[in-house]
């Protein structure tokens, strides 16, 4: 069992994600898939597909100072190709299972929200399985609010239908 004590901020840094970080990003995403409460996806995509799906700005990884290991990441995806929604993005955040509850999600959220606003994003949204209480709490702590509950939105490969809690954060700096 690992400790849930917050990691001293001197022990990690948050940096823009680069292509050479993607192997670790994909491994952390695969942990989320195996955990069963993070995504509908069955596997991580390759870099080219992932890179195409996500906005080029507001991509961050958490790296440990001592080893340079990637232990968390955050990225945004556009929600529509329509011009009126250019300032709306979906936020994805994943933390390595050994580092959950240590404050890395907080640090990533602060960076991700600030960067999104610097790039003109006025609304962030996230769809989260209701069983993923930790992620819901993290989002709420950073100003997201529940705006909907989508029942049986997607069917898992096992045949199980899963609900989604829709959370949204409206910027107080952009589009006000």
Walk through the language-model features, giving the residues of each.
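Conserved GNAT acetyl-CoA-binding A-motif
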Residues: 116-128
């Amino acid at each position: 069992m690992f400790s849930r004590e917050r990691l001293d901020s001197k022990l990690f840094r948050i940096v823009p994600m680069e292509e050479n970080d993607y192997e670790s990003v994909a491994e952390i995403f695969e942990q989320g898939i195996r955990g069963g409460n993070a995504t509908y996806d069955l596997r991580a995509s390759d870099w080219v597909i992932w890179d195409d799906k996500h906005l080029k700005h507001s991509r961050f990884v958490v790296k440990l100072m001592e080893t340079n290991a990637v232990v968390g990441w955050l990225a945004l995806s556009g929600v529509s190709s329509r011009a009126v929604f250019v300032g709306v993005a979906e936020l994805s955040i994943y933390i390595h299972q050994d580092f959950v509850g240590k404050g890395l999600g907080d640090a990533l959220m602060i960076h991700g929200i600030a960067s999104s606003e610097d790039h003109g994003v006025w609304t962030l949204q996230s769809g989260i399985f209701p069983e993923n209480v930790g992620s819901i709490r993290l989002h709420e702590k950073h100003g997201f609010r529940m705006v909907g509950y989508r029942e049986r939105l997607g069917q898992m490969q096992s045949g199980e239908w899963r609900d989604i809690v829709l959370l949204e954060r409206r910027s107080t700096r952009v589009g006000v």
